[in-house]
Amino acid sequence: MSDIKYELAHVGINAQNPEEAKATAALFAQIFNLQPREGNSSTFAGNAVEVMRTPYLGRNGHIGMYTADCEAAVKDLEERGFEVDMSTAKYKPDGTLNAVYLKQEVGGFALHIVRKP
């Protein structure tokens, strides 16, 4: 059993275009009383729902999982037989790993780990 802790960060939904992304995020925001906001490549409803402006990884979208130490989480996942796609890695300015996707989809969703803020 691993000592690495994971918790849900957000659910990502693939939209076909920016207009659909904005409308989808706005509806989630309205239903759940969340604050909509624009990100670099997506539109958010609060922190829980991310709607991609164009289709991205995962047939249905992605699920982001927080962890305190992404490097340790990558090691943990690989030791347990899960492959990490380092070509998707995002780094903080200080060079520490901030996010990375796994190669495997689950239920049509890509999975990625994100360093907990």
Q: For each predicted feature, which ranges?
A:
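Internal amphipathic alpha-helical segments of the cytochrome P450 catalytic fold
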Residues: 21, 74, 108-110
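Short, intrinsically disordered low-complexity segments
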Residues: 43-62
